[in-house]
Amino acid sequence: MHWILALSLLLLLLLLVASPRLAWLKAGLLSLLLLLLSAWGLVDRLSGDGVNAATLYHLRADMDGAGVSDFSGYIAVFIGMVLLSLSPLVLLRVRRFRRPRGGGAVFGAFVVMLLVSVAVSPLYRDGKRLYYQLRPVDYATVVPEYQVPQQPLQKRKNIVWIYGESLERTYFDEATFPGLMPNLHQLATEAVDVRNLTSTEGSGWTIAGMVASMCGVPLTTAPGDENSMGRMGLFLPEARCLGDYLKDQGYRNHYVGGADASFAGKGSFLASHGFDVVHDVNYFHDKGVAPKHFSAWGVHDDVLLDDAWDSFQTLSRAGQPFMLTTLTMDTHHPAGHLPLACKNQRYESPLGDIGLLHAIKCSDRLIGRLVTRIRNSRYGRNTIIVIASDHLAMPNDLSDVLAKQKRENLLLFLGKDIPPQQVVTRAGSTLDSGATLLQLLEPGMRTLGFGRSLLANDAPPSASVAASRDSGKNYPRYLAYARTLWTGRSTRMLRVNGNGDVVVGVQQVRPPVLLEYDDNTNLKTVYLENTSRQFDRTHSDGTLAYVDRCTAFEDGSADGDWCALVVDRNQHMKLYRDPDLTRGIAVDAPLDVTPQAPRPRVRQPIMLTQAARKTEAGRYMLELYAKRRPTRAFWVEAVSSERKVVLAQQWVVPDASGRIRMPVGLEHAVEDLEIRAWLDYTEEVSVDDLALVKDTAVADRS
């Protein structure tokens, strides 16, 4: 298919210069296609699977803590491709390539080839895949398959779960990687060694692999395009995961990881599902660990696993059953990192001097050392050790080699009473890891969420089986049910709580939020990004409910209260105010049937300050100059406390020079003062200069 795409792009280029008719339109369309393909190429290098669920998740989730510097080479190539994508526009400036004949036929051929190019490109494939995965489906048939553990544990053994970052079992292949992982290879002969373990959709990146293995469900965001990590108060509140179950059984759950726990919502997941302690990179900074022990992603694995050993001893001495979970980091794609403990260690390979191979060799030694310490300790007899890859390796310096191998995840279980065996699965995935551990703890337990024990010969239907059959035709039903775990299914009542969050079902969401319901008033989509644009462009057969400050809906609202605009399928509307939202409103309640005005174009807040600033109490004059601004009056306000408290607000009209002056009175010091304007999505404002003037002193400029 790649050669077909290359040929079609070449033909498009020839058709572009063949005729001047609609030349700029053709050049623009070709450049747009090339830009999209360039963006896809960058995403594919990062995800290893084009635009998939992981891509969408990380775009919506908090990206703080990502080691962006590791991908500088990919980004540089992407910038070069962007510049190359603009070449069709430059080409039109070369007059000699333009031929004034056959304009209509040439343009028709150009359109046909453009459609062919899209059809054979990965853009169409990934778009089709995402459509099938995210389209509404009836999940009712799989609801009975979602099972939570209820049976009490008779023997409460301690658990140590070691996730190896991208440390797939494929690296065990002695023909390709001789002697690369001798320690884990030896441990596999002493363990329950699970083979052919795959990663299904919604489990192929770190947080998704953890959710899949510990909850038995694929990770999807809540319905729609919401930034689930930054705006959702709870992480999968309707899911019941391994940590929840073990906590109910009297366990203490302890996590130690080297990366930032806020990245992709990992810390939120753990805190929401039974973990008592979550230590991340900040914990190691607070301990005073020297900078030489950190990479762009966080603390190195030698320091991390030493801390895990210390935690194991401390938890064991306490006498309470526990699950200690740790996640390594130094084998992260694309090139890995080498801690000080392995600086003098090298892996000699016919493949060459590849840094990632050194990192894998080091990780094998460090994990093997931790496991040996635990097993040889006086607490080892009462401990089950799980060694697992969080997911298959993403594109890295060994991608060309791995592409020729049979890829499989790593999953080992070691314990005193666990007889070694190799379990070859026919349709197993990381969704089944937690259920398998539960059977080792309690033989009668074989399910966790949609996961099924891989040791059970009579396991009931599972999501893993559905993902492996008929090209995964029925797997979207499991994804659809997993989405409901973000909000629950009773979502027709809305209210705003004392923290200013919208309560929908079991979830708490920071507004602005647009909720779309189907014609049966079942929650269909949640929008938390570009909400005013979505509201203007969404024409639903059901009901829309938009919750934001009343300023978004009314010119005369200056009290900072919350309002909800509800629009039914007949375009009847009602604006609910703060007292109604405090009590709660039913989105399926009948609305006023009197003639309605056109649906309003709601406003959205636009930040004018570059960052929040600490400001002392006193009276100020806000002065700003806006080079680009709306032609009409608009609201400007000062806010604090994560934009939840409105300190000052004024309806402003810039003068001819774009100057705006507004008094701001602060009764007490504010740690996070920000200035914002309320505009609809078609308007924009560009601030050239902004200052807070206190008496005659000028505050810091932003």
From Swiss-Prot:
Q: Which reaction does it catalyse?
A: a phosphatidylglycerol + a membrane-derived-oligosaccharide D-glucose = a 1,2-diacyl-sn-glycerol + a membrane-derived-oligosaccharide 6-(glycerophospho)-D-glucose
Q: Where in the cell is it found?
A: Cell inner membrane
Biological-process GO terms, alphabetical: glucan biosynthetic process
TM regions (residue ranges) = 3-25, 73-95, 102-124
Q: What class of enzyme is it?
A: transferase
User: Which topology term describes how it sits in the membrane?
Assistant: Multi-pass membrane protein
Annotated S-S bridges: none
| Enzyme Commission code(s) on record | 2.7.8.20
Instruction: Provide the GO MF annotations for this entry.
Output: phosphatidylglycerol-membrane-oligosaccharide glycerophosphotransferase activity; transferase activity
The job of this chain, per UniProt, is described as: Transfers a phosphoglycerol residue from phosphatidylglycerol to the membrane-bound nascent glucan backbones.
Q: Which family does it belong to?
A: Belongs to the OpgB family.
Instruction: Identify this protein by name.
Output: Phosphoglycerol transferase I
- What organism does the record attribute this protein to? Xanthomonas campestris pv. campestris (strain ATCC 33913 / DSM 3586 / NCPPB 528 / LMG 568 / P 25)
Taxonomy, top ranks, is: Bacteria, Pseudomonadati, Pseudomonadota, Gammaproteobacteria, Lysobacterales
List the gene name.
Answer: opgB
